[in-house]
Regions:
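Selected transmembrane alpha-helices and immediately adjacent juxtamembrane segments
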Residues: 2-51, 136-186, 216
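Residues within membrane-spanning alpha-helices of integral membrane proteins
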Residues: 17, 60, 115-119, 123, ...
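Residue-level signature of the transmembrane alpha-helical core
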Residues: 21, 25, 29, 60, ...
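Membrane-interface alpha-helices at helix entry/exit sites of multi-pass transporters
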Residues: 50-59, 83-87, 179-190
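Selective hydrophobic functional segments
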Residues: 57-113, 117, 197-247
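Transmembrane helix exit motif
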Residues: 68-79, 116-141, 251-264
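Hydrophobic alpha-helical transmembrane segments in multi-pass integral membrane proteins
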Residues: 155-165, 200, 205, 253-264
């Protein structure tokens, strides 16, 4: 980052805050449409030389603003099935807290192959089944289907607290399998993602693992990016969300495979 300081003449702290804001805007834009914004925002936080746990905690602070901005936009436009989402919120909240504080028996190294396999399967399914997620076919979710959704919400909450990036993408997958189109699945997912971020942030604050200034700098960008992204998703509909979804899952796959291979 020294070369940027030389070019701009800006103090280090000011430059870091500006870069986090820009990274937050890109992350918020992508995350508001299909999730996966953490693939941008977490590395940006790590570049500031924060300890990993503090980088994750600071990222949660910024992410909650981005998720909140997108959630408000989707709610105002009637895109959220709140009758279903409100039943899932407690499970996501509890799961995220558990994932953040628990000593998990399986370290991330062993969990990543499972995630890679899931992403490969769903990505190929979306590519070859072109009409999947294009039409909103959902009806009232109840009985066994509701119980499955609750278990899924709990599991994704744990995943968000334990690993993080890609949570929104997996939530969208779950809602599409329930019968929602890409757009409504993205809207529902954003509400749960906001909830899991809030739960995880509470724990990180309690542990003192949040750099507030860095988190708020990225949050400014997150709010702007999330607003633009959610508005664009509503304007363009499921076809846009599908394209961005495939792009993000492909990038996630490449990164996860690379990280897994380099850690062998």
């Amino acid at each position: 980052m020294d070369w940027l300081i030389g070019i701009t003449g800006l103090p280090y702290d000011v430059l870091v805050l500006m870069l986090l804001c820009v990274a937050g805007a890109f992350a918020g834009f992508v995350d508001s449409i299909v999730g996966g914004g953490g693939l941008i925002s977490v590395p940006a936080m790590l570049l500031t030389n924060l300890p990993p746990s503090v980088a994750l905690g600071s990222n949660k602070l910024s992410s909650i603003f981005g998720a909140g901005s997108a959630s408000v936009t989707f709610l105002r436009n009637g895109m959220v099935d709140f009758s279903l989402v409100r039943k899932l919120l407690p499970f996501t909240f509890i799961g995220s807290m558990v994932g953040t504080v628990a000593v998990v028996s399986l370290p991330p190294f062993y969990v990543k192959p499972i995630i890679i396999a899931l992403l490969v399967g769903v990505t190929l399914f979306v590519v070859f089944k072109r009409n999947w997620g294009e039409v909103n076919r959902t009806s009232q979710v109840m009985g066994r289907a509701l119980h499955i959704c609750m278990a899924f919400a709990l599991g994704i909450g744990i995943y968000d607290g334990f690993i993080g990036p890609g949570t929104g993408t997996f939530l969208i997958m779950g809602f599409i399998f329930t019968g929602f189109d890409f757009l409504h699945a993205s809207a529902n997912a954003k509400i749960l993602n906001f909830t899991s971020n809030l739960a995880s942030l509470i724990v990180f604050f309690y542990l003192g693992h949040v750099q507030v200034y860095y988190g708020l700098a990225a949050a400014v960008g997150q709010v702007i990016g999330a607003y633009i992204g959610s508005q664009l998703a509503i304007m363009k509909g499921s076809s846009l969300v599908r394209v961005v979804f495939l792009s993000v899952t492909t990038v996630m796959l490449i990164k996860l495979v690379f990280d897994y291979i380099t850690n062998l």
